[in-house]
Amino acid sequence: MSQEGSAKRADFKYKIGKIKHTPPVLKDVRSGLEFIELEKRDDEKVYGVTKFLGNYKEEKKLGQGTFGEVYRGVHLATQRQVAMKKILVKTENDLFPITAQREITILKRLNHRNVVQLIEMVYDYPPAQNGAAYGQDSSQASASADTMKSFYMILPYMVADLSGILHNPRVTLEMADIKNMMLQILEGINYIHCKKFMHRDIKTANILLDHKGILKIADFGLARNYYGAPPNLKYPGGAGTDAKYTSVVVTRWYRAPELVLGDKNYTTAVDIWGIGCVFAEFFEKRPILQGKTDIDQGHVIFKLMGTPSDSDWQLARYLPGAELTRTSYEPTYKERFGKYLTEKGLDLLSTLLSLDPYKRLTAMAAMQHPFFSEDPLPKLQLTLPCEESHETDIARYGQEMQKTVSNLPPAAPSGHAVEQSQTQQQSSRHHQSQPYQSLPPQKSSQPHPQQIPEAAPVQQPSQQPPQEPSAHQQQYSSRGPQQHRTTPAPTSLPPKPKPAPPGARYNREAPPQNKPVKPLTRHLGAQYQHNNYGNYYNHWQGGERYYETYNDGYPHADRYSDDTHYNGYGYRSRGYQRYDMRREGESRYNQRPYAPQQGAAYRPNRRDTYKLVDRTGQPYPPERVPNPELHPSPAPRPKRTLTNTTQLSSHSSAATGSTAASGSAVSNSSEPVRRSSTASLDNSESGNILQQKPPPPVANPLEARIYGRDEVQSNHPGGRLYPRSTPDSKNSEGAAPSEASTDPTKRNIVDYY
């Protein structure tokens, strides 16, 4: 049998196929990794990526990335423009760059409107293999045989980046535009930091802008994850950990001071420093900290923000480059940017460019800075001229500016009307865009004779209403468009929009409105409360409420608030404790009992009874005495008489005998003796006897059941008013088995529940 089984196993293995040749295990010299070199096939295919040929086409180079070039391309199937980031693999044995692997992995894990999106990856076959497919002859294919392999990261095409926008002379940014851009940058970097990543290359060239005015943070070639807690309103991400990273990151002009001093235990605050540099670059249109070397970069930083003291930055003395902190520079950022920013703007700039990374603002705290809530408020949507502005266009902008300066017409004589109007327009624009740094010069009372030419007097606008056009003017206007016709001002303007009403709904900072609050409508039930469509609880389709399992009235509260298992639906849906087998494997052995834990309102002196309050029964009003025919009361208790022992000697023997008989009756009774100090003496023939009157009927039938029980009721198990089973009942739990109990067809179904 064993030989037959082994033969079957060998036959089965042969049918699957045997490995004829095992490739040798090789070892990479640089990385020390072991790998297997597989033989190439003619139909080579890289799985997980798209083939470049036949799907995409390069058009124009846009810029240079960290480890590759960026091109503008076209997706041939949809004719949509895309940005193609080329990742170069130089030789056949070269590994895929680790920075590109990080960038692809991080972009796949990010999804935010202010972070660039990775569409797909594309693999370009080397032209040496597919020269004919590229439309090349053999000579062209052999000439380009040594070209490098390349992967492409396909990204959405952006019309501009921030460096091109700032250097474009035809684009002017207002303060509302700058605030909008800053908020978008802070939202994007806050999302990246909360996802436990550091960008480590924040600069204007890596902040892109699409045609809708949405900024997107790009170029994650130097990004990586960090260790520690994510940022909050006070501390940056990764604070308080011993993790060490490389300090040679970030472009030099945007490098934080802790990186300049050689700190390897940095946090997400290095990205906030770059955002502060970008914020200041909005106003000077050029990088604000242009150091020539790494040491010079530290001097440039301290010249702007001042040399840090021990109180400003306590840990600076322990960094490798602490010699730079021995300089003595005073901060000059207020003199440099005070002409552009208000006090709140300067405060935001100084906290973004704080030398101590732990005193630097986090992104979520910077978004709540009061600079963004003062006038002018940030624009809701960014609208810029539709012109492509990339980093590669900066040189072209400089050439255009030189050409325009050299080709300017000769200047007009001083005091000319055209020059005067142009200077007035420029001054008005300047005063609208920037706050006054000094008062404008006062106008002289006597005008200069050259300022008012005689040939072209200035016409003042007339205050008369516009006249009706003549027939000649109407005939002229009907022939064609009148180029220099001015539209008269409208006689009636549209009404101004009403301001938002005060209150917390429209203005959160408004004082509270101390008005009486209207109480909520009492829920009277479905047949009393209605909406516009009919039933209060449903929509217009009808009585769906009456067929649902549970409606809006559920879950309701427990009446006495003492049942821990009460779930609001009138039944105990789960008598056992829920547990997660994957997380707590031992919970199945730690089940709590089904018996509920009684609350504070439960009185356990008698079982299965709930007491509302501890009070004696109140008598019925005379008009509400229950009808004995409808509500038969139990048999009245016999009157119990007690002997007054102080007066036995002064009575007759008959009275003594009667009292003795009554005393024996009392002694044989099973009920406790109750004396009443307020009982009146009975002056009958039998002597002075204290008569015990029965208690008055109680008002609440439920309390009558609880307090007014006799011996028969209290002797039943559980203290129930009615016994669960009697010999006469059909279920006969406490009696001998009968035909009804043995026959399952005659058994009451209620007994099982």
Curated annotation (Swiss-Prot):
Q: Which GO terms describe its biological process?
A: positive regulation of transcription elongation by RNA polymerase II; transcription elongation by RNA polymerase II
Keywords of the record: ATP-binding, Kinase, Nucleotide-binding, Nucleus, Serine/threonine-protein kinase, Transferase
**SMART domains per UniProt:** S_TKc
Compositionally biased, Pro residues: which spans?
491-502, 619-636
Instruction: Provide GO CC annotations from the record.
Output: cyclin-dependent protein kinase holoenzyme complex; nucleus
Q: Name one GO molecular function term.
A: protein serine kinase activity
Q: Which residues bind ATP?
A: L62, G63, Q64, G65, T66, F67, G68, E69, V70, K85
Q: Using the UniProt annotation, give all residue ranges assigned to the region (Disordered).
A: 404-519, 585-753
Class in the EC hierarchy, top level? transferase
UniProt lists compositionally biased (Polar residues) regions at: 476-485, 675-691
Supply the EC number(s): 2.7.11.22, 2.7.11.23
Limits of the Protein kinase domain: 56-372
Q: Where is the composition biased (Low complexity)?
A: 420-462, 649-670
InterPro entries per the UniProt record, alphabetical:
CDK, Kinase-like_dom_sf, Prot_kinase_dom, Protein_kinase_ATP_BS, Ser/Thr_kinase_AS
- Report the subcellular localization: Nucleus
Bias (Basic and acidic residues) occurs at 605-614, 744-753
Catalysed reaction(s) here are:
L-seryl-[protein] + ATP = O-phospho-L-seryl-[protein] + ADP + H(+); L-threonyl-[protein] + ATP = O-phospho-L-threonyl-[protein] + ADP + H(+); [DNA-directed RNA polymerase] + ATP = phospho-[DNA-directed RNA polymerase] + ADP + H(+)
Which sites are catalytic? D201 (proton acceptor)
SUPFAM superfamilies per UniProt: Protein kinase-like (PK-like)
Gene3D superfamilies in the record: Phosphorylase Kinase, domain 1, Transferase(Phosphotransferase) domain 1
Q: Which PANTHER family match?
A: CELL DIVISION PROTEIN KINASE, CYCLIN-DEPENDENT KINASE 9
Q: What's the family?
A: Belongs to the protein kinase superfamily. CMGC Ser/Thr protein kinase family. CDC2/CDKX subfamily.
Q: What does this protein do?
A: Serine/threonine-protein kinase involved in transcription regulation. Phosphorylates the UBC2/RAD6 ubiquitin-conjugating enzyme (E2), leading to monoubiquitination of histone H2B and the silencing of telomeric-associated genes. Also required for histone H3 methylation. Necessary for the recovery from pheromone-induced growth arrest in the cell cycle G1 phase.
- The molecule here is called Serine/threonine-protein kinase BUR1
Question: Whose protein is this, by species?
Answer: Eremothecium gossypii (strain ATCC 10895 / CBS 109.51 / FGSC 9923 / NRRL Y-1056)
Q: Which gene encodes it?
A: BUR1
